[in-house]
Structure formats: C-alpha cells, structure tokens
C-alpha cells in the first residue's frame, strides 16, 4: 500500500493543506504542537475510523469551522483509489470511495491499512486492560471490517443490559424475562468477539515472539495470552459451547451484577496478558524493555496484515523512532526496508541513524503548514 496524496481541510490545525508523498520514508520535523501528530491521526482515521486522541468528531474539526475533510489517493496492489471522509462538528460522517458515497462505515474499512507506533503505545505494557483490548480490536477492524458491526451491536446490548441492572427492582417489576433476553444477546455476540480475539492472538504470538527474540538478542521469550472472563479452552471451540459457558458465567455473577448495577462478564472486561519469560511484562520497569516489547507487537501486526491482505500496510511512527537506540532502529529498518511506506514525526533529526535519512522526504511542519525542509536529502 502506498499513500500518494493527502488533503486536509479544516482538520485540527490544518486549514487547507495538500501533501504529496514522494519517497518510501517521509519524516515530518517540527516543534511540539505544530501539527505533526495531527497528520498521522488523519491517516489513522482513514485506516480505523477511530481517533485515539479524540472522544468526538467535533474535536477533529478546526475551531470555527462546521466540518472537516480528509481526502487521500492511495495505491493498493498497483491500483489507485480516491478516498474522502467528511466530519461534521454537530455529529455525523460521510465517506466516499472513488466518488461513490457509502452507507455503512464498515464498507470503508480496508481501504487503508496502517500500523501506528506512538508513545501512547507504551500503555500496552503498563496501562489498564482497556488499552490492550482497544489495540486488539483495532487490528481486527483492519483484518475483518465486519467486526465493526459486531462490536457496535455488543456495545448497544451492553448499554441496555446495564440500564436494566441499574433499575430499582420494586419500580421495574419482574426483570427476569427482560434480563434473560439481554443475557442471551450478550452471550451470542460476546462469544463471537472473544473467539475472534483469541484466534488473532494465536496468529500474532509466534510473529511477535520471533521479532522480540531478534530485537532482544534472543535473551527473552515473549508470550501473548487472552484471559477471557468466560472459560475458552480452544479459540476454535464450537460457538454453542462457548455461548453456554458464557451464560453459565453470567449466572455465577448474577448477585454481584445486581448489587453493582453493571455487567461483570464479557469481552469488555477481558484481559490480554503480555509475558516475558513467564512473568507479566508490566513488572519490567525498564523503558527499553517496554519499547522492545511494543516494537515486537507492532512488527507482528505489520507482518500479519501483510500476510492477510497481500500488501504491506503503512507504518506511522509518532515521536518514537528517535527514542529507540541504534540497534532497535536498525532492526526496524531491516524489517520494513523500502517496501513499507513509513511516515515518521520528530522534533529533531540528530538521533536518527543515517540509513533512515538516506533517500527520505523531509518535511517541515509549523503552525499547521507543511513545506519541504532544507534538510531534505536527494532521493536515492
């Protein structure tokens, strides 16, 4: 996959910016809060339809504007496609592919594939379980666009079930029939989500473990384990068996759920356990080890997306490359070579290995405006 052109209109601090990408590596240089991350955020939105930094679309629309627009020309397997996303400050989106409007957001997923590595990703190791669930779901959305509808349905059912749990039993009357209905819905959709997550981890683990061994010099062994609230002996287990176990787990927590007024069983509470040599990775205090682990996860994600789609995704590195030592920089460069288009943000070029700068397109970002940098090197 190759991103040829990007047009940001009233997006974040960009009023009307056009960028042509002319090399496999593009380095965006500028001080903090100038718009480097905003550009990567726009590309990530095209890939996942989600922003990790904004709770609502109105945060993405430039102050004083009614709507924002992201347009892109991407090349997939040698064929060019025109993409457009419009975000309205009052809510609502419109999506177009090659000029054709789409009714469902899931039909847009898969048009762009991207792997993002930013300082926020250290939360995969040291953060709450939600960070790891969000990462896993983000990978699934790119590999299986229909997963978006599954997650949205599950969230709606969870919301309805929690509302019923919060009702006063005396005021609500007999909740048993209603609860049985929502239990069955939660079990059906929840079991589909957890089975997909577990299968994805099965595919990611050997890839991540291999990358981790290479980066750490073979000194450590990485493991990825899905820990669902519902017993799951095998990700390939019969869906009906998993649903039955799901319902049994709900019944076991019924009293606690009524007391707390919230659902305690389901993929919204599951954990993804990252281990190093059999010990929880969050117990490792070294930031170097944490970065090694996250880098291995991201390289595994990149490799799996390429395996499934037959085309390497974009790689977006947000202010992390300069923080990697030369060994890790070289491991990453060896992994992507020239076949993976990479967009990198940084405040300075001094910590970059010369191999990263060779042939790179270097752009200066200042107050929402982008221009070629005097530091740009000729294309190799």
Curated annotation (Swiss-Prot):
Family statement drawn from the similarity comment of this UniProt entry: Belongs to the RecF family.
HAMAP family to which the protein is assigned, alphabetical: RecF
SUPFAM superfamilies associated with the record: P-loop containing nucleoside triphosphate hydrolases
Cytoplasm keyword on record: yes
Protein function: The RecF protein is involved in DNA metabolism; it is required for DNA replication and normal SOS inducibility. RecF binds preferentially to single-stranded, linear DNA. It also seems to bind ATP.
InterPro entries: DNA-binding_RecF, DNA-binding_RecF_CS, P-loop_NTPase, RecF/RecN/SMC_N, RecF_2
Single Gene Ontology MF annotation: single-stranded DNA binding
Keywords: ATP-binding, Cytoplasm, DNA damage, DNA repair, DNA replication, DNA-binding, Nucleotide-binding, SOS response
Protein name: DNA replication and repair protein RecF
GO biological process: DNA replication; DNA synthesis involved in DNA repair; double-strand break repair; SOS response
């Amino acid at each position: 996959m190759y991103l040829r052109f990007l047009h940001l209109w009233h997006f974040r601090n960009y009023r009307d910016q056009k960028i042509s990408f002319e090399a496999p590596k593009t380095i965006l240089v500028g001080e903090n809060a100038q718009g480097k991350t905003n550009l990567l955020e726009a590309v990530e939105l095209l890939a996942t339809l989600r922003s990790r930094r904004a709770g609502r679309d109105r945060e993405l629309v430039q102050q004083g504007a009614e709507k924002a627009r992201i347009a892109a020309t991407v090349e997939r397997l040698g064929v060019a496609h025109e993409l457009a996303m419009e975000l309205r400050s009052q809510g609502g989106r419109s999506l177009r592919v090659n000029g054709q409007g789409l009714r469902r957001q899931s039909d847009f997923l898969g048009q762009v594939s991207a792997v993002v590595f930013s300082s926020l990703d250290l939360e995969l190791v040291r953060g709450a379980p939600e960070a790891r669930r969000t990462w896993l779901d983000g990978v699934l959305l790119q590999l299986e666009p229909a997963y978006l509808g599954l997650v949205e349905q599950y969230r709606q059912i969870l919301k309805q079930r929690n509302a019923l749990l919060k009702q006063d039993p005396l005021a609500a009357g007999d909740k048993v029939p209603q609860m049985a209905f929502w239990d069955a819905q939660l079990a059906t959709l929840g079991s589909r989500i957890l089975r997909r997550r577990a299968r994805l981890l099965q595919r990611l683990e050997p890839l991540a473990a291999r990358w981790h061994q290479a980066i750490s010099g073979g000194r450590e062994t990485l493991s990825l384990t899905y820990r669902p609230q519902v017993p799951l002996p095998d990700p390939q287990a019969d869906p009906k068996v998993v649903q039955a176990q799901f319902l049994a787990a709900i019944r076991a927590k019924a009293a606690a759920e009524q007391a707390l007024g919230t659902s305690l069983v389901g993929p919204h509470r599951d954990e993804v356990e990252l281990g190093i040599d059999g010990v929880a990775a969050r117990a490792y205090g070294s930031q170097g080890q944490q970065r090694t682990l996250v880098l291995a996860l991201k390289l595994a994600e990149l490799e799996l997306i390429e395996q499934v789609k037959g085309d390497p995704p974009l790689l977006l590195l947000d202010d992390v490359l300069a923080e990697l030592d030369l060994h890790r920089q070289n491991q990453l460069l060896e992994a992507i070579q020239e076949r993976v288009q990479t967009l990198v943000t940084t405040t300075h070029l001094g910590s970059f290995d010369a191999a990263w700068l060779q042939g790179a397109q270097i752009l200066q970002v200042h107050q929402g405006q982008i221009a070629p940098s005097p530091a740009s090197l000729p294309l190799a």
